[in-house]
UniProtKB/Swiss-Prot annotation:
It comes from Escherichia phage 186. Belongs to the phage GPA family. The keyword Transmembrane does not apply. The gene is A. Endonuclease which induces a single-strand cut at or near ori. May act by forming a covalent link to the 5'side of the nick. Residues 609-621 have a biased composition (Polar residues). This is Replication gene A protein. The lineage of its organism: Viruses, Duplodnaviria, Heunggongvirae, Uroviricota, Caudoviricetes.
């Protein structure tokens, strides 16, 4: 069919200039989208800056690459899915208002006087600032800590304790300060003992001093702020296998920076004894269990010793894995948001696992089943902890131990354990097969993975898919942020005595004390953990039945809260008594700043001092080392370059040199006239004359 031919071109029909009208359904859909977008922007504005920054940045990238419609859809979807999760986190940290206990104790339940209104305004101001902790800098947090401490101090000074005994006065002070502390989600020291009326003056007085101490509040608020920020990152999904496994990027950065600052601080300090002899503090630090390599070696030696004891006693090894129910996990195994999450933090999950194990241990004790071993706490990709346990027991107790642990592990939220896969995820047991490897080999990977990634080159993580060598810092940052104890031995002898005996390098003195003491010392001296545990009484020895114990003595000085502190002085044989100890710490050391000469020598790459007493050459501070910018800079070179750029050069002022005595007289006269004019100007009622003079 041919087209219609018109006589003139303008006779042909043309398309409409305006678009067709929207249908009612399209209009309602558009209005709902606008309303949802406005609501999303409104609620997002109320969230902490650490959350808004990432969301706005992602929306800006989407708008630039895919258009504004895609960015708006992202904002609406984010607020719909993530806002309930953020509200769960906020309920755990925010202060919704002034508690009734604080209102009754501080304001007497009324605000009709000017003083009460002033106190209420201060309290409201501090509560509002507390709710902004995730976005506050360290200086702002320290300022809030000082304000809270001063507020509590003023409240305690205002209490009328006339006619009170000393104990009643301390109790009144404690309860008033405790209510204010609870207002800011900080549990007062000794709170459970004091509320149960099971305390003495020596315990309650230091607790009161802590609650009006600025330094104490500073540490509590910093810890809350750090946990709050990390919990928000978990809620929005930034801690997962899709973003950053185990810990957020800022958490790992803060951990690295804290480690660097700690080392820089220790490098400037020395240990000095009574005679003035000095040793480097950083060298002693690196030679202790604070060094990850030494810590890992000690853990491996201890677990190897437990395995030797297991073989001697005819025990068998079992490897268990305990995982919390799904409501404790923020994201799924695939990295998506878990709709069952109840807002639990990693510390909440660790508390659940600790309570679960306490019930299991009590059940085993009631049935007289004895086990010993080690448990390792490590995170899932979303930061939720789970436990790996290597336990040794009698062969006839294996099935009963498995049954007890399984029943307690499956008890909570058992309705979700409908498949074998779900049951295995909650609790998994595996017998140690000597043909496949030793018991130590089962946990060696977990120990190295959670410390420094030693001997794991090329191996990848099962959850995140990243190299284990690269995920080790994230795991350490996770444990430090949530204050989770990664390794704990169950059974055996205390490691403190073991370390003190290794400091003692005199076997003759040990043999002179007793044969039993010498056996314990020799085992510790040569690093034989199995022999040490057996010499102390075996893997199930009670603390009251130890052969060798640690000797503690009180210090001569008290701490800043008036408490008596104790320190380790040595060890003693329990059969002989603490009256005949062996002192392992004879020298009293104190931490002092390094000498200026030592600091100059310790600077790596610094210029050597001149041979003469006068150095006329330009110092290294004016001539910094030239960096080779043709190749990538190392981390240390980048930091030095940044510090050099930030450093301000001191402004040098030229000293005015007066010419002659006549000029000096003129200058002095001018200064006197200026002072005279200022005095006249400051007099009340003075007005300027027509010529401008006062």
């Amino acid at each position: 069919m041919t087209g219609v031919v018109y006589a003139f071109p303008w006779n042909a029909p043309r398309s409409a200039i305006a678009s067709s009208y929207l249908t009612y359904d399209q209009q309602h859909r558009r209005d709902r989208m606008f309303a949802a977008l406005l609501h999303a922007r409104k609620v997002l504005f109320l969230q902490p800056e650490c959350v808004r920054f990432d969301v706005y940045r992602t929306a800006a990238v989407l708008e630039q690459n895919q258009g504004s419609q895609r960015a708006n859809a992202f904002l609406i979807s984010f607020c719909k899915k993530a806002l309930p999760r953020l509200e769960l986190v906020a309920k755990k940290y925010e202060c919704s208002g002034i508690n009734s206990n604080v209102s009754a104790a501080v304001f007497d339940g009324h605000f009709d006087t000017q003083l009460m209104q002033y106190l209420a305004s201060r309290m409201v101001n501090m509560v509002a600032r507390f709710n902004r902790l995730p976005d506050m800098s360290r200086a702002d947090i320290d300022l809030l800590a000082a304000d809270i401490a001063n507020f509590i101090r003023a409240e305690l000074a205002d209490i009328d304790d006339t006619g009170f005994s000393e104990l009643k006065t301390l109790y009144t002070w404690y309860m008033r300060a405790g209510f204010i502390s609870l207002q800011f989600n900080v549990t007062p020291p000794k709170w459970e003992r004091v509320t149960k009326k099971y305390f003495c003056e020596d315990e309650i007085a230091p607790a009161v001093m802590r609650m009006f101490n600025e330094v104490w509040w500073r540490g509590r608020l910093r810890r809350i702020a750090a946990a709050w920020r990390e919990h928000l990152q978990i809620a929005v999904g930034n801690v997962s296998k899709k973003r950053h496994a185990y810990a957020s990027k800022n958490c790992v950065t803060d951990w690295r920076e804290q480690k660097r600052r700690t080392r820089e601080f220790l490098k400037g300090l020395d240990l000095e004894d009574e005679e003035g002899n000095r040793i480097s503090l950083i060298e002693k630090y690196d030679g202790s269990v604070a060094n990850p390599a030494i810590r890992r070696c000690e853990l491996m030696a201890r677990i190897r010793g437990f395995e030797n004891i297991c073989n001697e006693l005819g025990y068998v090894g079992e490897f268990y894995t305990l995982t919390a129910p799904s409501k404790y996990h923020a994201t799924t195994k695939a990295g998506y948001r878990n709709s069952k999450w109840n807002g639990a933090s990693p510390s909440d999950t660790q508390s659940y696992l600790t309570g679960l194990w306490a019930r299991i241990r009590a059940k085993l004790h009631r049935e007289e089943i004895r086990i010993f071993g080690i448990r390792v706490a490590e995170p899932h990709h979303d930061g939720t902890p789970h436990w790996h346990m290597l336990m040794f027991m009698l062969p006839e107790d294996v099935e009963r131990v498995r049954l007890i642990i399984r029943d307690y592990a499956w008890e909570e939220d058992h309705y979700e354990l409908r498949s074998d896969k779900a049951k295995k995820a909650r609790f998994h047991a595996e017998a140690i097969d000597p043909e496949k490897g030793s018991a130590t080999g089962y946990v060696a990977k977990y120990i190295s993975k959670n410390i420094d990634g030693y001997a794991l080159d090329g191996e990848t993580d099962d959850e995140s898919g990243e190299l284990l060598k690269e995920t080790a810092p994230a795991v350490s940052a996770w444990a430090a942020r949530w204050h989770i104890r990664q390794f704990q031995f169950i059974g055996g002898a205390p490691v403190t005595v073991y370390r003190e005996l290794r400091r003692m390098a005199d076997p003759e003195t040990a043999r002179a004390l007793s044969v039993e003491f010498a056996a314990v010392h020799d085992a510790a001296h040569y690093g034989r953990w199995a022999d040490y545990v057996n010499a102390q009484g075996g893997p199930f020895v009670r603390r009251d039945d130890l052969q060798v114990r640690t000797l503690y003595e009180p210090r001569t000085e008290f701490n800043q809260y008036g408490e008596e502190t104790v320190c380790i002085k040595g060890v003693y044989d329990a059969s002989i008594g603490a009256g005949s100890p062996i002192l392992t710490r004879l020298t009293q050391w104190k931490i002092v700043p390094k000498r200026a000469v030592d600091l100059a020598v310790d600077v790596k790459g610094a210029s050597a001092p001149s041979r003469s007493s006068v150095n006329n050459c330009t110092g290294s501070e004016s001539d910094p080392p030239i960096l080779d910018l043709t190749k990538p800079l190392s981390r240390r070179e980048r930091r030095e370059l940044t510090n050099r750029l930030r450093k301000k050069k001191p402004t040098t002022r030229r000293k005015f040199i007066h010419g002659t005595d006549k000029q000096n007289v003129a200058i002095t006269k001018t200064i006197d006239e200026i002072h005279s004019d200022n005095r006249h100007h400051n007099q009340p009622g003075r007005s300027p004359a027509p010529d401008g003079r006062w």
